[in-house]
Design a protein with these regions (language model features):
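Short, structured surface patches at the beginning of a domain
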Residues: 1-150
């Protein structure tokens, strides 16, 4: 009698993300790690979502589809490796919002950081994103100067 899975309303979803296509191996490692985690707890994973893009980008298609499914109450559990694999900033807000939708987020590597350590990680993330944008602008400027039609 007592198998709780029979009463499960929504799906169990593994969500993985890397910042760029060059990290696809890391994406696969996340998937395998999270599947092992779920299996060890007797959880049946209904869907695996693999996303490529910045955690600061809230226009990620896979991520938005996941949020939409949560709002439609089709998801009961999201399993992630780290908070920053879900969103880079504002995790607590999303966690509270999704909890109201009946969704539990399970963080496998939930290391506790001091406020100072979190601030340093946030600053490093911001610097990384903006340095990438500067590089992209330089590349664009160079391309513009080389294009004779412009």
């Amino acid at each position: 009698m007592g198998i709780q899975e029979e009463n499960k309303v929504g799906k169990v979803v593994i969500y993985t993300r890397v910042s760029n296509p060059g990290q696809k191996d890391d994406l696969e490692n996340q998937v395998e790690f999270l599947k092992t985690f779920a299996n060890a707890r007797g959880m049946i994973v209904d869907e695996v979502i693999k996303d490529i893009g910045s955690g600061l980008n809230y226009k990620r298609k896979q991520w938005n589809n996941l949020i939409d499914s949560c709002m439609e109450r089709n998801i009961s559990t999201i399993i992630i490796a780290h908070k920053d694999r879900f969103v880079r900033f504002g995790y607590e807000w999303f966690e509270k919002f999704l909890r109201k939708m009946g969704v539990e987020i399970m963080i496998v590597n939930n290391e506790k950081l001091s406020p100072q350590e979190e601030l340093v990680q946030d600053l490093i993330s911001i610097i990384h994103v903006f340095s990438g944008r500067i590089y992209g602008l330089r590349k664009y400027k160079k391309k513009m100067s080389e294009d004779e039609d412009l």
